[in-house]
């Protein structure tokens, strides 16, 4: 089987960039079973309601949905199981500190396969936006669309 030379996005959490102010991002590996990888390769996953949490000195991806593989029979996985994230000790300590001391949240932004065909998760350290911040984001987005439309009309 030929390896992919580009990054294949499986799931994207577009709502996270609207609801949170992203401070920093980092790439994490995932501990997956065989049927989970096969289901991801078919492009089936949902990380909209998922989040990451520190438990027992490890970081876990909670509430992500990877549906069962159709040909997985009795060896299929549980769709909403907790998945361990693979990070260095230094990265785990930095994330744990940000969550505990600074009141930040770990939010998954994107689930993808890298150039080597390995499933990765783009994890963000983020701070929740207030309602007025969300309104400001909407205003800026509408204004940029309006500017683009006006420039297009003028030629």
UniProtKB/Swiss-Prot annotation:
Compartment list: Cytoplasm
Gene3D superfamilies (alphabetical): 2.40.280.10
Cellular component GO terms, alphabetical: cytosol
GO terms, biological process: trans-translation
Keyword RNA-binding in record: yes
SUPFAM superfamilies cross-referenced by the UniProt entry: Small protein B (SmpB) (SSF74982)
GO molecular function (one): RNA binding
Coiled-coil portions: none
CDD domains xref list: SmpB
Major localization listed first in the record, in broad terms: cytoplasm
Domain of life: Bacteria
The keyword Metal-binding belongs to this UniProt entry's keyword annotation: no
UniProt xrefs under InterPro entries: SmpB, SsrA-bd_prot, SsrA-bd_prot_CS
Function: Required for rescue of stalled ribosomes mediated by trans-translation. Binds to transfer-messenger RNA (tmRNA), required for stable association of tmRNA with ribosomes. tmRNA and SmpB together mimic tRNA shape, replacing the anticodon stem-loop with SmpB. tmRNA is encoded by the ssrA gene; the 2 termini fold to resemble tRNA(Ala) and it encodes a 'tag peptide', a short internal open reading frame. During trans-translation Ala-aminoacylated tmRNA acts like a tRNA, entering the A-site of stalled ribosomes, displacing the stalled mRNA.
Similarity remark: Belongs to the SmpB family.
Protein's UniProt name: SsrA-binding protein
Biological source species: Chelativorans sp. (strain BNC1)
Phylogenetic classification of the source organism: Bacteria, Pseudomonadati, Pseudomonadota, Alphaproteobacteria, Hyphomicrobiales
């Amino acid at each position: 089987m030929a390896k992919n030379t580009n990054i294949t996005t499986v799931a994207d959490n577009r709502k996270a960039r609207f609801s949170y102010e992203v401070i920093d991002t980092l790439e994490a590996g995932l501990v997956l079973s065989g049927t989970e990888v096969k289901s991801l390769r078919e492009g089936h996953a949902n990380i909209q309601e998922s989040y990451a949490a520190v438990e027992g000195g490890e970081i876990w991806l909670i509430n992500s949905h990877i549906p069962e593989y159709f040909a997985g029979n009795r060896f299929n996985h549980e769709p909403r199981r907790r998945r361990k994230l693979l990070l260095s000790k230094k990265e785990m300590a930095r994330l744990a500190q940000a969550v505990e001391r600074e009141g930040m949240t770990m939010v998954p932004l994107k689930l993808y396969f890298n150039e080597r065909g390995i499933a990765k998760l783009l994890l963000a350290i983020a701070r929740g936006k207030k309602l007025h911040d969300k309104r400001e984001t909407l205003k800026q987005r509408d204004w940029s669309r309006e500017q683009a439309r006006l420039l297009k009309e003028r030629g």
